Design a protein with these regions (language model features):
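C-terminal boundary and immediately downstream tail of ABC-type ATPase nucleotide-binding domains
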Residues: 121-150
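Catalytic Walker B motif of ABC-type/P-loop ATPase nucleotide-binding domains
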Residues: 54-57
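Conserved ABC ATPase signature
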Residues: 29-33, 37
Length: 150
């Protein structure tokens, strides 16, 4: 626990709300917040105590693609700005490719593959290939990549 005064704690809360672009939302009830705003509140709550690690479980679930991109960008900015290690559990390939640096692919609770997003496009691991290329967009990216490298 902390020895901060109530005024100091309120100042810190307002700072992190501002950091996640919710500076005018501190008087709103949860039901008054959109899904994206609720995700940003969760991030603010996670960083208010200056953690060394940020854990995000499906940060984009239930969000439209545009809001999901906003959340991805915010997570990346927070990770860089606070110099923290961020661990994200997601099934969203767009997020993996957008903000994943070191990617660990699990299957049935066991490590199946590990590498970078670039290496993910090159792997022959069948489970990873099936997951990554379940999207037509990523299938086209892989085909273009393989044509370039051959």
């Amino acid at each position: 626990f902390t020895k901060q005064s109530q005024a100091e704690m309120l100042e810190r809360v307002n700072f992190v709300l501002d950091r996640v672009n919710l500076e005018n939302s501190n008087d709103k009830l949860p039901a008054e917040l959109s899904g994206g705003m609720q995700k940003r509140v969760a991030i603010a709550r996670a960083i208010v105590m200056n953690p060394k690690y940020l854990f995000c479980d499906e940060p984009n679930s239930g969000l439209d693609p545009q809001t999901a991109t906003v959340i991805d960008n915010l997570i990346q900015e927070i990770t860089d700005e606070y110099k923290i290690t961020t661990v994200i559990n997601t099934h969203d390939m767009n997020s993996v490719m957008e903000i994943g640096e070191n990617i660990l692919f699990l299957k049935d609770g066991k490590k199946e593959w590990e590498g970078s997003s670039d290496e993910m496009f090159k792997t022959d691991n069948e489970s990873v290939v099936n997951f990554v290329y379940s999207s037509n967009l990523f299938k086209k990216v892989r085909e273009a990549y393989l044509k370039e490298t051959n």
